[in-house]
Amino acid sequence: KKYQNDANVTRLLHLDSETLLSLCPAEDKLFEVSKSGNVETTFGERPIVEEMNNAYNTFQGNVEYNSGRDLLVYSCMVFPYVAVYKQSGLKDWKLVSELKGAWDYSMSEGKLKFASSSPRGASELALTEDYIVLLQRDDTVEESVPREKAGRDLSTLPKSLFVYDYKLNLKKIINMPFPILRLCGD
């Protein structure tokens, strides 16, 4: 299958052999569903509604789809935010759960800037049959890292797994003795 090179898309999921879901963080609607190359619908409100010219960087994140439950999970990497959407049809997606962390930001010259004390979001996301697993820093047991230093600096990788049910109730925090780069689930 040939993909179009779309610089606005940062994540791409196959919902079935002909249907793609794209995360488009610079757009007003975060998600686009296309079937056989034709856009069928867009959905997903931005968690921060102010107009900004750095939305592409601000709303990048991870998306995973649980086909057994028809649920899409989105987690933002730049700030703590998780959303769960229920699919009832190709064009019918409804926000069913949302988890907003505490974040502090300001606007300057059209750019959204987070305070250095604001926590980052989950760096990875994985789904199991019954749980959402997020890789993120547990500030109660891990050293805090300045926002400027986090990112691709491997010395700042988180060591904690936050396990949620699909209603976004925290079930468990697993603090690992080593840093984690990637997650996968099945």
For the regions a language model picked out, list residue spans one by one.
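Short consensus segments that form the blades of beta-propeller domains
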Residues: 72-75, 113, 148-154
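Short glycine/acidic-enriched loop and turn motifs that connect beta-strands
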Residues: 25-29, 79-81, 139-143
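Surface-exposed loop and turn segments in beta-propeller and other repeat-based domains
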Residues: 2-4, 40-58, 90-117, 177-179
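Short coil/turn segments that connect the beta-strands within blades of beta-propeller domains
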Residues: 16-18, 68-70, 123, 129-132
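Repeated scaffold domains used in trafficking and secretory/extracellular systems
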Residues: 5-17, 55-63, 120-124, 178-186
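Short, conserved, GDST-rich strand-edge loop motifs in beta-rich repeat architectures
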Residues: 134-156
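Beta-propeller blade signature
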Residues: 33, 149-169
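Conserved beta-strand positions in repeat-built beta-propeller and related beta-rich domains
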Residues: 21-26, 66, 74-77, 134-136
